[in-house]
């Protein structure tokens, strides 16, 4: 408890799933939390949960495709809390789009949400982190940034790009004591997985079991397991960790199996 006491953290894409889990985990460790999401109802629900955990919170509906909204949100967080210590770039989209038929509009959507938004969020929080003597930027990557996965090639490309982005940012910002890292989950038992199965699997139960089987420990990860990694990277315990990607995937990326069924 209190590993993040008095730190101010921004979590994007916090309307549900892993983003909400990270926000709650940060709150439980003493952080003040700023959450945003495209879904207003969902992000306000997250704010309520965080507040009930005893943390101060600010929540806004924003479209991360809009640079002005990103800049405005970061400014609002700085105005409210007078500092920013941590940024979690979690917001993402993952349309299923085969390489031979993906539409230009879909490419633009994935690039804007998954890559441009983290770059812009980083740009706007860096001055505040410099003011307080450092900070932690954590980008949500994915095993798809390491291994090839059919149907999500552009999504995987953006996740691989985030890993490269973090390494470059980490070196550039090291003298400012701003650490930059990525986390690459495997499959996680989350609303995103549930939506993916509902939209793409003919037999949801069978497909869900297939995802469990391809992970060496026999099950997919949990939101709490992923959130714990983010807490660690945001804390002073990770003071010497930067330019690093932590694969939190139960060994999935090493064996590289694809789900079937």
Task: Give residue spans per PLM region.
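Conserved glycine-rich cofactor-binding loop
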Residues: 8, 15-17
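Substrate-binding pocket helix/loop in short-chain dehydrogenase/reductase
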Residues: 98-99, 103-111, 211
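Alpha-helical segment proximal to the catalytic Tyr-Lys
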Residues: 127, 171-175, 239
């Amino acid at each position: 408890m209190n590993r993040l006491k008095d730190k101010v953290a921004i979590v994007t894409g916090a309307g549900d799933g892993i983003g909400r889990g990270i926000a709650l985990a940060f709150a439980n460790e003493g952080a003040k939390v700023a959450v945003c999401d495209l879904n207003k109802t969902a992000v306000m629900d997250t704010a309520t949960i965080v507040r009930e955990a005893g943390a101060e919170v600010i929540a806004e509906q924003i479209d991360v495709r809009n640079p002005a909204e990103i800049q405005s949100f970061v400014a609002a967080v700085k105005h409210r809390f007078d500092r920013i210590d941590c940024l979690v770039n979690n917001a993402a989209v993952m349309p299923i789009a085969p390489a031979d038929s993906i539409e230009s509009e879909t490419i633009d959507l994935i690039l804007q949400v998954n890559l441009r938004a983290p770059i812009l969020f980083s740009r706007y929080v860096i001055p505040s982190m410099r003011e307080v003597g450092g900070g932690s930027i954590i980008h949500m990557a994915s095993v798809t940034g390491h291994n090839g996965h059919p149907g999500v090639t552009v999504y995987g490309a953006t996740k691989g790009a985030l890993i490269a982005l973090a390494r470059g940012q980490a070196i550039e910002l090291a003298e400012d004591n701003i650490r930059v890292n990525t986390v690459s989950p495997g499959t996680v038992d989350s609303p995103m997985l549930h939506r993916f199965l509902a939209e793409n699997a003919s037999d949801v139960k069978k497909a869900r079991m297939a995802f469990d089987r391809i992970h060496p420990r026999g099950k997919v990860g949990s939101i709490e397991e992923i959130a714990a990694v983010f807490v660690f990277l945001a804390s002073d315990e990770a003071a010497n960790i930067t330019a690093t990607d932590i694969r939190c995937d139960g060994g999935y990326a090493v064996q590289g199996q694809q789900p079937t069924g």
